[in-house]
């Protein structure tokens, strides 16, 4: 199988007023095409730090990360990040609105995605009116 991700001797340290904190200490793993990886552990063990580094949100202290050309890494947090004062369609459109500008084409594109993923009857609803799984789908779109 072809490796899509290789992480070798990855470490992340933070400086605090109390000294250095080791968030990730020398981890190594790889992921083949069509493999799944679950990252589990106790609170504060470095799961989010690892994901932030892999997604390019944070930097590593040392180590090597090789990502297959063209592959992008993203992740979804357990808690949704939807704005409670916006309906589902407006929440889902927000990223495109900010990155570009609000257009009829963007709204139509997002609406089609929401319908495709089973949210047709919820476009005008607000996040509190949806189940956790439905809110996750909106956040993913």
Residue ranges of model-derived segments:
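ABC ATPase nucleotide-binding domain "signature" region
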Residues: 38, 138-141
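The feature captures the beta-strand-to-loop junction immediately N-terminal to the Walker
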Residues: 40-42
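Conserved ABC ATPase "signature" region
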Residues: 104-122
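Short coil-to-helix segment of the ABC ATPase nucleotide-binding domain corresponding to the Q-loop/switch region
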Residues: 86-95
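Conserved ABC ATPase signature
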Residues: 126-130, 134
